[in-house]
C-alpha cells in the first residue's frame, strides 16, 4: 500500500513539507487485473472512475489506460461514506478478490 501519510512511504517527507493535510487517495497492488476486477465487482460502495472529482469513493485501474503500472495497481480515492461502512465494504471486497 502507498499513502503519503505513512512514515514508511517514500513520499512521506515531501508530503509532510508540502501539505497541511494528507489526501484520502491510497494506492495498492492486487497482483493481477482479474483480482482488481473481482475487487471492484465485490465493492458495493466503490465506483470505478478515472477522475477523482466527486464525494463518493472511487477506484481507478491505471494499467487499463496504458500507464506503466502493474496490472493489479489500484488508486482508491476515499469519499464521504460512513467510515465503518467503507472499511467493511473494502475488507469484504479484498477478501473476495
Give, region by region, the residue ranges found by the protein language model.
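Short catalytic/ligand-gating loop segments at beta-alpha or beta-beta junctions
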Residues: 2-5, 51-55
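N-proximal accessory regions
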Residues: 21, 31, 48-49, 55, ...
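Short, flexible coil/turn micro-motifs enriched in small/turn-prone residues
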Residues: 19, 48-49, 67, 74
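A common structural junction motif
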Residues: 41-54, 93-97
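A generic structural signal for well-ordered coil/turn residues at beta-strand boundaries
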Residues: 22-24, 53-55, 70-72
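Conserved small-domain helix->loop->beta segment predominantly found in fold-type I
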Residues: 1-43, 60-67
Amino acid at each position: 500500500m502507498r499513502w503519503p501519510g505513512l512514515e514508511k512511504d517514500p513520499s512521506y517527507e515531501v508530503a509532510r513539507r508540502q501539505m497541511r493535510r494528507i489526501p484520502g487517495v491510497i494506492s495498492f497492488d492486487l497482483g493481477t487485473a482479474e483480482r482488481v476486477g473481482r475487487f471492484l465487482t465485490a465493492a458495493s460502495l466503490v465506483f470505478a472512475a478515472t477522475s477523482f472529482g466527486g464525494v463518493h469513493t472511487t477506484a481507478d485501474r491505471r494499467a487499463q489506460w496504458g500507464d506503466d503500472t502493474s496490472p493489479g495497481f489500484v488508486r482508491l480515492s476515499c469519499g464521504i461514506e460512513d467510515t465503518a461502512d467503507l472499511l467493511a465494504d473494502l475488507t469484504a471486497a479484498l477478501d473476495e478478490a
